[in-house]
């Protein structure tokens, strides 16, 4: 952008240049000639050296005035300062009317000065009054977009519904595009608007009143009723009394919902099967408990037998210890069995003694042995016989 404050200071430093009255006016044009472009580039470089900030396109957009053209030709010849290049001419009435018509529909027309207005009128709201009053060049901005194009763009935006982040490609809810009408009740003479009705009523195009009415006159003058199962109108002959569903669909509905009652024979068979199943489960439980009792008793019996046999073995080991007391002269000897003392005598009296010992031993064995265990009984009898044989052998050997 142009440095307006610098331009204003430049005008204060250098007096304005007066254009001679006999200067030939060049033909008006919107674009500068080649000579003017070369001279403007020289002046632009000079202004950049002096501290002015001019855009490259600022001179190309605004054509120079007659005074500026004369100034371009006399700047270097007369020695005047080149700072008066901001003078522009007022366009002809035809061009002014064209730009005024184009700027009429421009929303930013209040920022653009009309041809013939001063810089102070358009820049007073942006710059201080002192600086705006000192800058007096006249210029204008051409409208880049016409009002017709802008109106067309706004119309297209409203039709497309492009509203900055909102998906409005389709019309809003409740609205209908061109050629479409809101759903209405299909009953004869009923034009109820179903836009705000329930989705069910909008879908089947029936209002709430006619969906429950017993008789509805539809198109063609037919007396019908709305079926709640089929969601459409049927003739009155297809309904039973005041039912709201037709006969066919109501029968299907009842068959699905209701369950048939079982017969007496089926109930008896089911009861017997249940009783048999319960009895079998009970027998199985009793047999398992009985087997457990037998196993527990057998284990206890085996454990008791083992303990008893251990005690008997210890007793027999002690009873097998035989103490013999022999007389030094060899006349008499005495054998002592554990708990069974007897004296030796002649050979004739040996058998009764053996019989006495046998009877005593048998009685002792009967006292300590349990009669229910045959195996242990045979074992102890065999050991007793061996003990008796040993005693008889000792007696015979002594005599």
From Swiss-Prot:
The keyword S-adenosyl-L-methionine does not apply. Residues 1-28, 250-292 are annotated as: Disordered. A zinc finger (SBP-type) spans 182-260. Zn(2+) 1 binds at residues 185, 190, 207, 210. Residues 15-24 have a biased composition (Low complexity). It is found in: Nucleus. GO terms for cellular component: nucleus. InterPro entries: SBP-like, SBP_dom, SBP_sf. Zn(2+) 2 binds at residues 227, 230, 234, 246. This is Protein LIGULELESS 1. It comes from Zea mays. The gene is LG1.
């Amino acid at each position: 952008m142009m440095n307006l404050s610098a331009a204003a200071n430049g005008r204060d430093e250098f007096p304005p240049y007066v254009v001679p009255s006999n200067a030939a006016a060049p033909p008006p044009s919107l674009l500068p000639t080649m000579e003017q472009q070369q001279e403007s580039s020289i002046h632009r470089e000079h202004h950049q050296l002096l501290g002015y900030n001019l855009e490259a396109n600022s001179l190309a957009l605004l054509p120079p005035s007659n005074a500026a053209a004369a100034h371009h030709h006399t700047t270097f010849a007369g020695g005047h300062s080149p700072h008066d290049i901001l003078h522009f001419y007022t366009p002809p009435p035809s061009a002014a009317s064209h730009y005024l018509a184009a700027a009429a529909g421009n929303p930013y027309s209040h920022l653009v000065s009309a041809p013939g207005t001063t810089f102070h009128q358009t820049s007073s709201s942006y710059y201080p009054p002192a600086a705006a009053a000192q800058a007096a060049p006249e210029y204008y901005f051409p409208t880049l977009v016409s009002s017709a194009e802008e109106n067309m763009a706004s119309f297209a935006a409203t039709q497309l519904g492009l509203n900055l982040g909102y998906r409005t490609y389709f019309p809003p809810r409740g609205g209908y595009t061109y050629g479409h009408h809101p759903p209405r009740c299909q009953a004869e003479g009923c034009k109820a608007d179903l836009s705000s009705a329930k989705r069910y009523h909008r879908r089947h195009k029936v209002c709430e009143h006619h969906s429950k009415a017993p008789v509805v006159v539809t198109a063609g003058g037919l007396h019908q009723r709305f079926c709640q199962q089929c969601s459409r109108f049927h003739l009155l002959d297809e309904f039973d009394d005041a039912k709201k569903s037709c006969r066919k669909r109501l029968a299907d509905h009842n068959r699905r919902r209701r369950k048939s009652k079982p017969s007496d024979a089926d109930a008896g068979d089911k009861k017997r099967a249940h009783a048999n199943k319960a009895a079998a489960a009970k027998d199985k439980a009793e047999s398992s408990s009985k087997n457990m009792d037998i196993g527990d008793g057998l284990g206890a019996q085996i454990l008791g037998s083992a303990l008893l046999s251990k005690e008997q073995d210890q007793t027999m080991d002690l009873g097998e210890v035989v103490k013999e007391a022999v007389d030094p002269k060899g006349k008499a000897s005495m054998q002592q069995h554990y708990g069974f003392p007897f004296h030796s005598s002649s050979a004739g009296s040996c058998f009764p003694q053996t019989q006495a010992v046998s009877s005593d031993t048998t009685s002792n064995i009967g006292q300590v042995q349990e009669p229910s265990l045959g195996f242990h009984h045979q074992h102890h009898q065999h050991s007793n016989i061996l003990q008796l044989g040993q005693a008889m052998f000792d007696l015979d050997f002594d005599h």
